[in-house]
Design a protein with these regions (language model features):
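Well-ordered, non-membrane alpha-helical segments in soluble/globular domains
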Residues: 194, 238, 287, 318, ...
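Conserved adenosyl
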Residues: 113-182, 186-190, 205, 225, ...
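C-terminal alpha-helical "lid/dimerization" subdomain adjacent to the S-adenosyl-L-methionine
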Residues: 421-430, 453-509
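Short acidic-aromatic active-site loops that bind/stabilize oxyanions
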Residues: 20-21, 25, 271-282, 341, ...
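Mobile active-site "lid"/loop adjacent to the S-adenosyl-L-methionine
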Residues: 394-436
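Core SAM-dependent methyltransferase catalytic element
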Residues: 383-384, 504-505, 514-529
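Helix-to-beta-strand junctions that scaffold the AdoMet/dcAdoMet cofactor pocket
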Residues: 449-450
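N-terminal accessory segments
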Residues: 1-241, 301
Length: 529
């Protein structure tokens, strides 16, 4: 397989990690059969008939539409209808249950370790997959295409958590990647681990000779992209609870009984995965930063505020870029660069402070809420005598992840252009409200970004009809599921830009970037003023 085909496999794996739990859960609840028996079904009809959480059921149905099993229509009423692929998929749905059981069983163990009990549960699945006996035989060529798609789902659920564990635990160190090795060199239970390596050998990731394993070129391709799986796999604690999400008490899925600890996502894994995924877009940000800090000194911002600074890596990177590659870098003695890391999470602030000190970078670290810029500006002025408006404001993949606030204006809104599925704690949110909430959120920031603007990297949804035509060419399905079920609000790129305009702000086209630059665009960089 060439690189394009291998990249396509990753996208299909990610599709599977989110879609398989939905298929099994809806099949168990007889919702798939109900859809099969009816031509068109409205969301409200399904939610009422099956006593489902309407908001998350909407997310689930849109995922199935993105995978080509349903047609999904938002206006005039939200409804779905089966496509020609639907009944073929339904024929295989029962056979996917053991995979879902394995996912659920694994959640009782450490997400980032290989333990004996999950291995034992995994072993028969690996064997039946390798023997191609997990799914019934295809009836014809068309049926075989659906079977292949579902086999990728299974493969994704088996491979995804595995490659992330290997990546986070040092398997892709040069020691293993550049020479052959035995199972016992890596794991204290070599017999079980060997079964896993044999499965990966079946997938052509390794060559095996006399119980020695060595990476193939194909295996190296996946190993180097292990972080691509990290964000989606980090949500398996939530996806494994699909029954609760769709039909139960959703608060049990999101937080522990004390209400403090996130239990729907493995945050360390999420950060590890997103770090790898974000690197591509930071290169484009470099170009924009260099341009801004090469302007005459009196036209430059006093510094940068990174909202949602995480571990401080972006601030550290930006400092090095400005110091070494811009006019400002030559005048830091007379025009010091004020770097500010702001985050809602106290642990992130501690890590940022420690990392910046360790790298000999002077920076301010401050608690901040993306939904309350007035307080942030006051604290910044009070503690450091810095005006928020004198800084270039930045954030990466954050605005869609703000805590839901119902918009002040809910009546007389323009009809939404979005085809997204949005919820808060399982409750269905009108798309008009989601757009208006973003408009009002941006308006809060307007007084503080009028001078130098807001440089924002943002994630977007795309129409499920576009996604379904591009299976294997986009990660949109995985993004829609993980964000939809965790109450995050990713709007289409054109809808996002329209919300910016409605807020009274504008987009500087000179600083706009879109990835990819076609109808599949689901990541953008904008300078908003």
């Amino acid at each position: 397989m060439d690189k394009k085909d291998l990249r396509s496999v990753i996208f299909r794996h990610l599709d599977g990690i989110v879609t398989l739990p939905i298929l099994v859960t809806l099949h168990n609840a007889d919702i798939l059969q109900f859809i099969s028996n009816n031509d068109k079904v409205t969301l409200s009809e399904l939610a009422t008939q099956f006593n489902a959480n309407e908001g998350y059921l909407n997310v689930a149905l849109r995922v199935l539409a993105s995978q080509g099993f349903l047609n999904y229509q938002v206006k005039p009423k939200l409804f779905v209808e089966k496509t020609s692929k639907f009944n073929q998929m339904l024929r295989y749905a029962d056979s996917l249950k053991p995979v879902m059981e394995m996912i659920q069983f694994s959640q009782g163990f450490h997400n980032r370790l290989f333990e004996k009990e999950p291995f034992l549960k995994l072993k028969p699945l690996l064997e039946s997959y390798q023997n191609d006996t997990l799914l019934p035989s295809a009836l014809n060529d068309e049926d075989n295409e659906i079977r292949k798609q579902l086999n990728y789902y299974v493969e994704g659920c088996l491979v995804g958590p595995t490659i992330v564990r290997l990546g986070m635990n040092g398997m892709f160190h040069k020691y293993f990647m550049e020479s052959s090795f035995k199972a016992e060199e890596y794991h204290k239970d070599p017999e079980s681990f060997e079964k896993l390596l044999d499965f990966l050998t079946h997938l052509c990731w390794f060559n095996k000779k006399n119980n020695n394993y060595s990476f193939t070129d194909q295996g190296l391709f996946f190993a180097r992209r292990a972080t691509s799986y990290g964000v989606t796999v980090s949500y398996l604690p939530m996806l494994s609870q699909m029954q609760h999400l769709l039909f139960g008490n959703v608060s049990e899925v999101k937080q522990d009984k004390g209400g403090q600890q996130e239990i729907h996502v493995d945050r360390a894994m999420n950060v590890w995965g997103s770090g790898g995924a974000h690197a591509t877009y930071f290169k484009a940000v470099d170009e924009l930063i260099i341009e801004i800090f090469n302007k005459p000194l009196n036209e430059q911002p006093k510094g940068i505020l990174d909202m949602g600074c995480g571990n401080g890596a972006l601030l550290e990177h930006l400092f090095e870029t400005i110091e070494n590659r811009t006019l400002r870098g030559k005048h830091l003695e007379t025009h010091p660069l004020f770097l500010v890391g702001a985050d809602y999470n106290q642990e992130a602030l501690k890590i940022t402070r420690a990392n910046l000190i360790a790298n000999d970078i002077w920076a301010k670290v401050i608690w901040g809420d993306i939904g309350n810029p007035v307080q942030l500006a006051a604290d910044l002025k009070d503690e450091y005598n810095i005006e928020l408006n004198d800084l270039l404001n930045m954030r990466t993949f954050l605005d869609h992840n703000r805590i839901w606030e119902q918009p002040v204006k809910t009546e007389g809104l323009e009809e939404s252009l979005s085809t997204g599925a949005y919820a808060t704690n399982g409750l269905l949110l009108p798309n008009e409200w989601v757009e208006q909430s973003l408009v009002e959120h941006l308006q809060k920031w307007q007084p503080f970004i009028s001078k130098f603007g807001l440089l924002v990297i943002e994630l977007h949804t795309i129409d499920s009809a576009i996604t379904s035509k591009n299976i294997g060419l986009t990660a949109a399905t995985a993004y829609d599921a993980t964000h939809g079920f965790s109450d995050q609000y990713i709007l289409e790129l054109d809808v996002f830009e329209e919300c910016v305009k409605r807020s009274g702000l504008s987009v500087d086209d000179n600083y706009t970037r879109k990835y990819p630059a076609d109808e599949r665009s689901n990541i953008s960089i904008h300078l908003i003023k």
